[in-house]
């Protein structure tokens, strides 16, 4: 999926954070945004994944303007692991990861065997399958981050937005994450790993 930003501008309290940012990422392209703390990297990503609406400019997913799409439509195309995840879920790990399947469901549609298979595969990918029945709130910060990544993988989108995804991860799991997205194997989450 191609993600395009055109002339994105965002300001807070009379301070211009983003000034005319334009970029394009092509299908299956791995893109990194670098810069010092406070330079607007997360602000740009929040515009891309709909948390912020830019003061000016637009974001396009495969040529379609993001804010003209329904939230469900954009969630079928793009999953997000945000920099800060403040969740106090009283759900099991498996239930949290199942939330990633929501964009593919009709209202009140029940989870099926395929959903559980996708969730189990996502948990295995992030090495959290042994925690499937644990309550999310009992996990460490790094374990929670891996569950949120599994939820994004279970969403099975063609784009995955990661904002400082190694936050809270120990070095072993930082390396695992980097290998997951830089290995020569297909990164299409719709294919089995």
Show which residues each predicted segment covers.
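Helix-to-loop junction immediately C-terminal to a conserved catalytic motif
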Residues: 49
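The feature captures the beta-strand-to-loop junction immediately N-terminal to the Walker
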Residues: 34-36
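Conserved ABC ATPase signature
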Residues: 109-110, 135-139, 143
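Catalytic Walker B motif of ABC-type/P-loop ATPase nucleotide-binding domains
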Residues: 160-164
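Conserved ABC ATPase "signature" region
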Residues: 98, 113-131, 156
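Conserved ABC transporter NBD signature motif
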Residues: 57-65, 74
């Amino acid at each position: 999926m191609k993600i395009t930003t055109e002339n994105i501008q965002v300001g807070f309290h009379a301070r211009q954070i983003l000034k005319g940012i334009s970029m394009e990422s092509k299908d299956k392209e791995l893109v990194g945004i670098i810069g010092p703390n406070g330079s607007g990297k997360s602000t740009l990503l929040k515009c891309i994944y709909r948390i912020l609406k830019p003061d000016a400019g637009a974001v396009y997913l495969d040529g379609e303007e993001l804010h003209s799409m329904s939230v469900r439509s954009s969630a079928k195309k793009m999953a997000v692991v945000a920099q800060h995840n403040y969740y106090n879920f009283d759900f099991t790990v498996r239930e949290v990861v199942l939330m990633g399947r929501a964009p593919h469901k009709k209202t009140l549609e029940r989870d099926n065997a395929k959903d559980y298979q996708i969730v189990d595969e996502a948990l295995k990918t992030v090495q959290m399958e042994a925690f499937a029945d644990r309550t999310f709130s009992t996990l460490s910060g790094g374990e929670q981050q891996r569950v949120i990544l599994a939820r994004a993988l279970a969403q099975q989108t063609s784009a995955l937005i990661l904002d400082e995804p190694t936050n809270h991860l120990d070095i072993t799991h930082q390396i695992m994450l980097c290998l997951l997205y830089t290995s020569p194997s297909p990164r299409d989450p719709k294919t089995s790993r």
